UniProtKB/Swiss-Prot annotation:
This is 4-hydroxy-3-methylbut-2-enyl diphosphate reductase. Pfam families: LYTB. Its cofactor is [4Fe-4S] cluster. It comes from Streptomyces griseus subsp. griseus (strain JCM 4626 / CBS 651.72 / NBRC 13350 / KCC S-0626 / ISP 5235). Keywords: 4Fe-4S, Iron, Iron-sulfur, Isoprene biosynthesis, Metal-binding, Oxidoreductase. The active site is at E135 (proton donor). Isopentenyl diphosphate binds at H50, H83, H133, S231, S232, N233, S276. Pathway: Isoprenoid biosynthesis; dimethylallyl diphosphate biosynthesis; dimethylallyl diphosphate from (2E)-4-hydroxy-3-methylbutenyl diphosphate: step 1/1; Isoprenoid biosynthesis; isopentenyl diphosphate biosynthesis via DXP pathway; isopentenyl diphosphate from 1-deoxy-D-xylulose 5-phosphate: step 6/6. Belongs to the IspH family. Binds 1 [4Fe-4S] cluster per subunit. Dimethylallyl diphosphate binds at H50, H83, H133, S231, S232, N233, S276. (2E)-4-hydroxy-3-methylbut-2-enyl diphosphate binds at H50, H83, H133, T173, S231, S232, N233, S276. [4Fe-4S] cluster binds at C21, C105, C203.
Length: 329
């Protein structure tokens, strides 16, 4: 009689932190509160956050997502997404007599303010980011004559500045930390006097989620990142997992997108989610994996997050006014 070989226990390593960051949480709640406060429709310029499920859920509640301000009927309410907008967009909204609610993430606003400040001092600003991303378009719009985009280390050779003693780098908030520093190092080799921003532009949540996914990659044969294909921070997490040694890593919006073939020979699955992803989607993946024998779930914690941001000021003002009116009755 042959000896029985024990099957290795299948398990899931669940990253913590994962999912919603403070800026996304604030933006999503802002749309929900605006719908409650003013009624549908609430127009939102671009997807409020880059997640298919979140956008579809808010559409069902009465949010209408538009690509350009001209699509918003005059006199309506328009909310700007968490990614931020250029000053020209604020001007367009004023021209159309739109009531605006600015749900730009405060960490993106910080980069906007840095751009304005350095442009005022006549610096050449090298903005590290991905061409066409809404956040990059918004930041570039703050100082179009001073900002040039650097889309990775391979772009550095083409960068030219007016005065090498007055150059500063800024970055999109959702990039790979490692790749950004590689770009910065290349820029510093070319421009030794390159100035750095006063504090990191890459946001705390992006950094924390990348650190967590690196930890998963140490032990998992497969890493699944829940997130949308247009989510910069989610895409970066797949890249970071592969760079950190994970044999395979994939991005999915929903559990139904997972290919059973990915699990072949896999005993340990690493699971995390992008900063725009509600936990209900991660729960769906856990359930799907559980049905296939990956019932043992172990949380891998690499950081605590307690940051919260207050709602956009326009919304806070109206909510306060309503509360005051109710208490006066």
């Amino acid at each position: 009689m042959g000896r029985m070989t024990a099957t290795p226990a299948r398990r899931v390593l669940l990253a913590a932190p994962r999912g919603y960051c403070a800026g996304v949480d604030r933006a999503v709640i802002a749309v929900e509160k605006a719908l409650e406060q003013y009624g549908a429709p609430i127009y939102v310029r671009h997807e409020i956050v880059h997640n298919k499920y979140v956008v579809q859920t808010l559409e069902k509640k009465g949010a209408i997502f538009v690509d350009v301000t001209a699509e918003v009927p005059e006199g309506s309410i328009v909310m700007f997404s968490a990614h931020g907008v250029a000053p020209t967009v604020h001007a367009e909204a004023a021209e159309r007599k739109l009531a605006t609610i600015d749900a730009t993430c405060p960490l993106v606003t910080k980069v906007h303010k840095e751009a304005v400040r350095y442009a005022k001092d006549d610096y050449d600003i090298l903005l590290i980011g991905h061409e066409g991303h809404e956040e990059v378009i918004g930041t570039s719009g703050e100082a179009p004559d001073h900002i040039q985009l650097v889309d990775g280390p391979e772009d550095v050779a083409n960068v030219e500045v007016r005065d090498e003693s007055k150059v500063v780098w800024l970055s999109q908030t959702t990039l790979s930390v490692d790749e950004t520093m590689e770009t910065v190092d290349a820029l510093k080799s070319k421009f030794p006097n390159l100035l750095s921003p006063p504090s990191d532009d890459i946001c705390y949540a992006t950094q924390n989620r990348q650190i967590a996914v690196k930890k998963l990659a140490e032990d998992a044969e497969l890493v699944i990142v829940v997130g949308s294909k247009n989510s910069s921070n989610s895409i970066r997490m797949v890249e970071v997992a592969l760079d950190a040694g994970a044999p395979a890593a994939h991005l999915v919006d929903f559990a139904s997108e997972i290919d059973e073939a990915w699990l072949e020979g896999v005993t340990t699955v690493g699971l995390t989610s992008g900063a725009s992803v509600p936990d209900v989607l991660v729960d769906g993946v856990l359930e799907w994996l559980g049905e296939r024998g990956y019932a043992d779930v172990e949380t891998v914690k690499t950081a605590d997050e307690s940051i919260t941001f207050s709602l956009p000021k326009e919304l806070r003002r109206d909510l306060r006014a309503e509360a005051a009116a109710l208490s006066a009755e």
